[in-house]
């Protein structure tokens, strides 16, 4: 099995959303090393065991690749060192997604049901329920922003959000504004 970035054609926004999809599903999340920085790795087995991209100089802790391992000339998303300095990097996106998963255990433990009334256009919505707690996750899988009407759902609060393109996710009264490839996690208002 290859890494997510390759399946997403190294598109930063699609790769970020795919990471959120993985991390917001129930059960144990699995991140194969390098997934969080968008490393390539598909096809033959040696390419899946490439050295981790620690820095652009490739000389700090980098191991010798296995024979027949195809290393890219440039890192598709930059090295870890580069991404740590970029607030909008894939690595920082993964850190945010993991923090949300840890802060809202219903995401990892909850039973998933579709929220078909909120699925409009390219917005996918599902509810996670665990220990009498619920969250609703909405993901915009389109290249353009989307508005979602929540008026039939009562009072919900935007608990967390992930923006793939840096645009803010906003809940105005009963309308949720989701940018392209944006993810919102709603909790019932207290």
Each predicted region: which residue ranges?
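Loop/helix patches that line or flank the sugar-binding groove of alpha-linked glycan CAZymes
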Residues: 9-135, 141-146
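C-terminal beta-strand-rich structural cap/linker in extracellular carbohydrate-active enzymes
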Residues: 171-190
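Active-site clefts of carbohydrate-active enzymes
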Residues: 1-10
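Solvent-exposed beta-strand/loop surfaces of large extracellular or lumenal domains
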Residues: 160-174
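Beta-strand-rich binding/interaction modules
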Residues: 145-164
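Short, flexible beta-strand-to-coil junctions
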Residues: 129-131, 163, 189-190
């Amino acid at each position: 099995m290859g890494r997510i970035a390759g399946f997403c054609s190294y598109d930063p926004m699609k790769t970020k959303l795919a990471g959120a999809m993985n991390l917001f599903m129930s059960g144990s999340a699995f991140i194969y090393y390098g997934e969080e920085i968008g490393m390539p790795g598909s096809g033959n087995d040696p390419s899946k065991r490439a050295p981790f991209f620690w820095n652009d100089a490739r000389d700090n802790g980098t191991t010798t690749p296995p024979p027949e391992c195809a290393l890219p000339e440039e890192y598709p998303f930059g090295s870890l060192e580069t991404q740590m300095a970029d607030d909008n990097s894939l690595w920082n996106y993964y850190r945010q997604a993991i923090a949300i998963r840890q802060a809202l255990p219903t995401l990892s433990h909850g039973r998933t049901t579709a929220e078909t009334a909120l699925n409009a256009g390219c917005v996918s919505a599902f509810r996670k329920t665990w220990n009498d707690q619920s969250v609703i996750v909405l993901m915009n899988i389109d290249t353009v922003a989307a508005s979602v009407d929540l008026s039939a759902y009562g009072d919900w609060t935007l608990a967390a959000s992930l923006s793939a393109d840096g645009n803010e996710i906003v809940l105005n009264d009963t309308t949720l504004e989701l940018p392209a490839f944006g993810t919102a996690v709603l909790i019932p208002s207290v």
